[in-house]
Amino acid sequence: MASVESRIIAITGGASGIGAATCRLLAERGAAVLCVCDISPKNFDDLKISIKKINPSTKVHCATVDVTSSVEVRQWIEGIISDFGDLHGAVNAAGIAQGAGMRNTPTIAEEVDEEWTRIMNTNLNGVFYCTREEVRAMKGLPATDRSIVNVGSIASVSHMPDVYAYGTSKGACAYFTTCVAADAFPLGIRINNVSPGVTNTPMLPQFAPMAKTFEEIEESYKKEGLSLIEAEDVARTIVWLLSEDSRPVFGANINVGACMP
């Protein structure tokens, strides 16, 4: 079982979905401090309560951060170092979805500038800002195994013609991760990317806005050859990458969940 005992971990998008599932598993595996940020504070109290039930020894520090702002990201990471003196790992899980099935073919003709820019700012620029500040912080700390995990999507490798901005942002995230992994590895910082398949999170309905029930959403994905997984399935892979059990692994893009090629 992958252990993160006594570690200080930063998690973006940590108040819900994959981020929250990762927080819960990190607490179960003995993390000392979870520094959680999200664009909305509405789920912070529920997260703290759930973590306390799992492991009363794990401290949870929550902050409202917009990852599309490099200034806010920098202040958040600098605050972690100032408050706790270390940063062993980070999970960049903040992201936004793009609705499918609402546009006429060819769907590219209806892609609008504002939607493209909005998604790129969060899913790509946000990952860049966070990874950059995490590496900046980690390189000045004592040498030990340090790990950063970026959360992408199976859309980065699966051909999905109605989610251009989302798929492109996640493909760029995977490529960025492999590049920066080679750059940071000599410093003892491992960086990897996880690409989940269709995951049962609060963001799921945004991908299928025409569906009225969860069953309709699940059935629509089955027709496309996609299987539904749980956030906890992804969290187990993320926590493994944060642990010393994955020490030889860097620059990887790990798919979690089945999908249509």
Curated annotation (Swiss-Prot):
Chanoclavine-I dehydrogenase; part of the gene cluster that mediates the biosynthesis of fumiclavanine C, a fungal ergot alkaloid. DmaW catalyzes the first step of ergot alkaloid biosynthesis by condensing dimethylallyl diphosphate (DMAP) and tryptophan to form 4-dimethylallyl-L-tryptophan. The second step is catalyzed by the methyltransferase easF that methylates 4-dimethylallyl-L-tryptophan in the presence of S-adenosyl-L-methionine, resulting in the formation of 4-dimethylallyl-L-abrine. Pathway: Alkaloid biosynthesis; ergot alkaloid biosynthesis. NADP(+) binds at I18, K48, D66, R132, Y166, K170, T201. The active site is at Y166 (proton donor), K170 (lowers pka of active site tyr). InterPro entries: NAD(P)-bd_dom_sf, SDR_fam. The keyword DNA-binding does not apply. The gene is easD. GO terms for molecular function: oxidoreductase activity; oxidoreductase activity, acting on the CH-OH group of donors, NAD or NADP as acceptor. It holds the Pfam family adh_short. It catalyses: chanoclavine-I + NAD(+) = chanoclavine-I aldehyde + NADH + H(+). Ergot alkaloids are known for their toxic effects on humans who consume contaminated grains or livestock that graze on grasses harboring ergot alkaloid-producing fungi. Due to their strong affinity for monoamine neurotransmitter receptors they may also have clinical uses such as treatment of migraines, Parkinson's disease and cerebrovascular insufficiency. Belongs to the short-chain dehydrogenases/reductases (SDR) family. This is Chanoclavine-I dehydrogenase easD. It comes from Aspergillus fumigatus (strain ATCC MYA-4609 / CBS 101355 / FGSC A1100 / Af293) (Neosartorya fumigata). Its EC number is 1.1.1.332. GO terms for biological process: alkaloid metabolic process; ergot alkaloid biosynthetic process; fumigaclavine C biosynthetic process; protein homotetramerization. Induction: The expression of the ergot alkaloid synthesis cluster which leads to the synthesis of fumigaclavines is positively regulated by the brlA and stuA transcription factors. Keywords: Alkaloid metabolism, NADP, Oxidoreductase. It comes from the Eukaryota.
